[in-house]
């Protein structure tokens, strides 16, 4: 059974099961910017719900507001109207410190560029989120090493980013996002800088980790083939989110 057939089977099994808890919800999200003296509405009454272990793709034209939506979902940007809840807790009802603590505990982030610290090894880059949470260096490295093993890079733990390939660097970034065992990972064009075969491998890895760790993924992508491998697809057009029917892969 090849990777894509396996993914489709797992997606169908996931969708056919009982409804699972929502880990991330957004209701009535509107986002407006001032540009050239005019109000520009990027998001218009967007509704999003992400269930435990679900893989959700967000697609749309360049400049349609996909990254803005991801930043709002992650609590990195505030909506002009509407509400985002993470693990049932609305961001607007939390003090800034509580919101930051919740985000750091329950969310992971992966970007198109890996944002690894060049002077640190892969192991120490992955351990960094745990060290920020005041975990001891020994324990943080233990968990980081386990996560690197899960992304197939245990043998590269002592290498710095400059000594790794593009695909390896992105796998380290994925390990870093998952090392805190978040409920949901927000990924903004995570394969955008990779060649076709490497992108396919990294995307399959994310879907497999979502299944084994029961972690939700919200993935912004321009690639329709990759999006089709997720459980659901939302298209952002003119500020409005539309759910698209699943297409067999």
Swiss-Prot record:
Belongs to the ABC transporter superfamily. Lipoprotein translocase (TC 3.A.1.125) family. This is Lipoprotein-releasing system ATP-binding protein LolD. One of its GO terms (molecular function) is ATP hydrolysis activity. Part of the ABC transporter complex LolCDE involved in the translocation of mature outer membrane-directed lipoproteins, from the inner membrane to the periplasmic chaperone, LolA. Responsible for the formation of the LolA-lipoprotein complex in an ATP-dependent manner. Keywords: ATP-binding, Cell inner membrane, Cell membrane, Membrane, Nucleotide-binding, Translocase, Transport. It comes from the Bacteria. InterPro entries: AAA+_ATPase (IPR003593), ABC_transporter-like_ATP-bd (IPR003439), ABC_transporter-like_CS (IPR017871), ABC_transpr_LolD-like (IPR015854), LolD_lipo_ATP-bd (IPR011924), MacB-like_ATP-bd (IPR017911), P-loop_NTPase (IPR027417). Pfam families: ABC_tran (PF00005). One of its GO terms (biological process) is protein localization to outer membrane. The gene is lolD. It is a peripheral membrane protein. It comes from Burkholderia thailandensis (strain ATCC 700388 / DSM 13276 / CCUG 48851 / CIP 106301 / E264). Its EC number is 7.6.2.-.
